[in-house]
């Protein structure tokens, strides 16, 4: 299998040949630089979690239109990326197609989060990424520490007491889990929760994570020997095997199929902007820990939403019991709007209907939107997403604010 750098060069060369232009400068830009490239203001904030991770937040405080609100304050919309992703997800399409720009132009104060261990959140008060302890976490810690820290920072800066949350993939899993663990009313900071490609169970998942779950038994002790400890960077022979197994028979460019993001989420889409693919690949994957990937694999085998399984001895130490506990989504009590696709590899429609919808309190599910011909990445990069998803959410939030909610 070609190395990541070789894949990048191949995709870049193909794009330059096919579309007749040099490499797009956005491939080397940061999220704030992309935002400013299109004439929008970009602000950067650091926030430190209770366990010492320093997360970088990106903000578009206003757009290119003059929108006034009854109380003089712009509603805050917080967008949280998915697995192996970053804040760039919301800005790498054109301004007329990217969620962050559309919401900014609609008059919202847009905040983009970055989970620990991705491109923008590689700092800790005491640890360095070269330390194995830096990577000792999964999405358990993201929901416990990262979400509260980021959201409370956005509210502190804007002087507001609640906001509207849009999550994609892991950004939904962590929010469902955070709300299910809420014992002190923290959930009141979330006015409405818009869940794109929502994840609860991944029992019926397809792609790379399904391959790993099937290939190795639950009792397998060599996860970290295979994947490496620390940042998730699989060995070449592993990804070669996965690529051949997952991508066999699919009509996709080899460079795209080699990309771990598409191996996880599904490479087939009929609504991606082909000219932007080199930019997608340049910014994604954005990094996570091996332990986080192992947690996802455990979820595939578990069939529900378990906390990280440390093994019998480790579970007794962390949870006070031998068996790993699971999150209880029936306790989620904020208004939820679901947007899920019939062609999604990671947020499989069967998992949405058979698990998520049966575990959420029906009174909290305000909308349940099934979208046709949507795969996992179409929710953030699909050309139909503005009309099918972003514009309806913009209207929902606007009406909520104007009605004084």
Curated annotation (Swiss-Prot):
Bilayer-spanning residue ranges: none
Positions annotated as active site in the UniProt record: 169 (nucleophile), 344 (charge relay system), 376 (charge relay system)
Induction: Up-regulated in the intestine by fasting. Down-regulated in response to a high-glucose diet.
Pfam families: Abhydro_lipase
Any Gene Ontology biological process: lipid catabolic process
Record localization: Secreted; Lysosome lumen
GO molecular function ontology, one term from the record: hydrolase activity, acting on ester bonds
Name of the protein described by the UniProt record: Lipase lipl-1
Source organism of the structure: Caenorhabditis elegans
Biological classification of the source: Eukaryota, Metazoa, Ecdysozoa, Nematoda, Chromadorea
